[in-house]
């Protein structure tokens, strides 16, 4: 995957991926700040600022931003994560310059209006209601993450705690913007039917005069391994399903641990609960009929430690304690017997096939480049996928033995009330 990378004197990094299959361009800007950077008291401020970024600049009113994109047949949006906040326009390639003009204006001269801020805060509170507070499973998972990431930058949800959202001040937004929205804290990603060199020159034209900012080096505490078993339970409506959530603290590719561990954990996630043929699916869903669904999830592409999550949706009236005991028993058995070569080979093929096929999407290409750049990793995604083939049975056994023990486990049971 050929990626053309450049940088400006003010610290802005640019990554361009040419794809000539259609006359379109996806232009993105990624800021290296997300909810994991936020101190207590203003959790969710990155997400709140994302909303305010569409309220206008000195050059473009909010109506201008919307009409320019819509009238040119494009779409625009944004998203916030633990590690970054990104904005994008997707439209005909002739509009690349307009994308860059909009984003340079937003980076340098966003307008903050209390008359826009107050109603938008209500919008965010309602978004929290719809996505989290009114959904038992989402609310429970939020509490599970809080427990697992206790005393770290990821303890709070991306959208923020309700009481913090209610107490935001406009000055909080201004300060967050001034601290983090600067060229030396951003990556521009351009993917589509464009000329890389010409695209870089356009970026240079619109961004080179924006000054650097003194970015505060925020040190976020990371979760520690083997700090003791953490458990909680939540009761909810009797009409909703019950669930078991389990998580083991594990390293990512950004942490200073054995470089093979994240790749072995990717393989293990697929073998344990990543597909219909996975061990947990076969044992707990099909053979024992304890759950209607179970899966495992792990990503090596995070800033700091990650959590290897196992989620099980219980069948009617099944004991959640029995389900967790069964999962732990299966993990212990896999430790003792090891995975088979067939399981290992199948997982490698499935993971690589899924990733390669997903790269057919322009959005996926750009999002991968942007997320990798934002957490300080090499943007050549295939480099990581190819390393999966080096994972051995012993590597998988090693990570099972190292990380999958009771002292490194957090679990939450979502019970019927």
Task: Outline where the language-model segments fall.
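Generic, well-ordered alpha-helical scaffold segments in large soluble proteins
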Residues: 106, 127, 202-209, 249, ...
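Short pre-active-site segment immediately N-terminal to the catalytic Zn-binding motif
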Residues: 34-42
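C-terminal, helix-dominated tail/subdomain
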Residues: 370-380, 388
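M16/insulysin-pitrilysin zinc metalloprotease superfamily fold
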Residues: 56, 90-121, 275, 300-358
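Active-site SXXK
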Residues: 43-57
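Non-catalytic beta-strand/loop surface segments
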Residues: 1-35, 59-95, 131-185, 209-255, ...
């Amino acid at each position: 995957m050929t990626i053309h990378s450049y940088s400006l004197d003010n610290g802005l990094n640019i990554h361009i991926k040419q794809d000539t299959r259609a006359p379109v361009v996806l232009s993105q800007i990624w800021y290296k700040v997300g909810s994991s950077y936020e101190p207590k008291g203003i959790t969710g401020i990155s997400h709140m600022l994302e909303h305010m970024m569409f309220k206008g600049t000195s050059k473009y009113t909010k109506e201008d931003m919307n009409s320019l994109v819509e009238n040119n047949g494009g779409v625009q949006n944004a998203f916030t994560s633990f590690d970054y906040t990104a904005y994008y326009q997707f439209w005909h390639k002739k509009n690349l310059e307009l994308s860059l003009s909009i984003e340079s204006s937003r980076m340098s001269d966003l307008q903050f209006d209390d008359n826009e801020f107050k109603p938008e805060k209500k919008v965010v509170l309602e978004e929290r209601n719809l996505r989290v507070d009114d959904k038992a499973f989402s609310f429970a998972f939020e509490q599970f993450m809080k427990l697992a990431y206790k005393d770290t930058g990821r303890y709070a949800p991306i959208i923020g705690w309700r009481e913090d959202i209610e107490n935001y001040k406009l000055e909080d937004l201004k300060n967050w913007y001034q601290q983090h929205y600067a060229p030396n804290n951003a990556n521009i990603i351009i993917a589509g039917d464009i000329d890389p060199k010409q695209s870089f020159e356009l970026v240079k034209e619109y961004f080179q005069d924006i000054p650097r900012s003194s970015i505060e080096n925020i040190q976020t505490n990371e979760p520690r391994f083997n700090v003791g078993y953490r458990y909680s339970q939540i009761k909810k409506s009797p009409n909703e399903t019950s669930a078991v959530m389990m998580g083991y603290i594990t390293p990512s590719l950004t942490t200073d641990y054995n470089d093979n561990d994240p790749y072995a954990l990717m393989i293990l996630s697929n073998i344990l609960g990543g597909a219909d043929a996975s061990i947990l699916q076969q044992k707990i869903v099909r053979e024992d009929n304890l759950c209607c669904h179970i899966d495992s999830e792990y990503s090596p592409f995070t800033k700091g430690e990650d959590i290897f999550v196992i989620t099980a949706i219980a069948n009617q009236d099944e004991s959640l304690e029995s389900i967790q005991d069964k999962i732990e028993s299966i993990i212990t058995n896999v430790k003792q017997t090891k995975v088979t070569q067939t399981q290992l080979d199948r997982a490698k093929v499935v993971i690589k096939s899924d990733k390669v096929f997903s790269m057919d999407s322009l959005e996926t290409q750009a999002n991968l480049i942007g997320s990798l750049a934002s957490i300080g990793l090499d943007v050549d995604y295939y480099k990581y996928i190819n390393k999966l083939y080096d994972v051995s049975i012993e590597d998988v056994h090693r990570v099972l033995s190292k990380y999958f023990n009771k002292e490194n486990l957090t679990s939450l049971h979502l019970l019927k009330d």
